[in-house]
Amino acid sequence: MDYTLNGKSRSSEGYITVAAVVKAETGDASPKGVAVAVNGDVIPASDWSYEVTDGDEMDILIAVQGG
């Protein structure tokens, strides 16, 4: 299955959930300060069990503090 993550092509054998992708990217399955959008729709953390499908475009946004 092929999908896009933050503008870069990715592939996975079999199904993968949003939570699994977030964990792979951040090291934590439910990190604070992280927002996820799939195909332009924000996915609440309570729905991160959503299975990414072939062709999905996913964005992970991480809040950072700065000044």
Task: Name each region found by the language model.
Residues 1-66:
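Ubiquitin-like/PB1-type beta-grasp interaction modules and other compact soluble beta-rich domains
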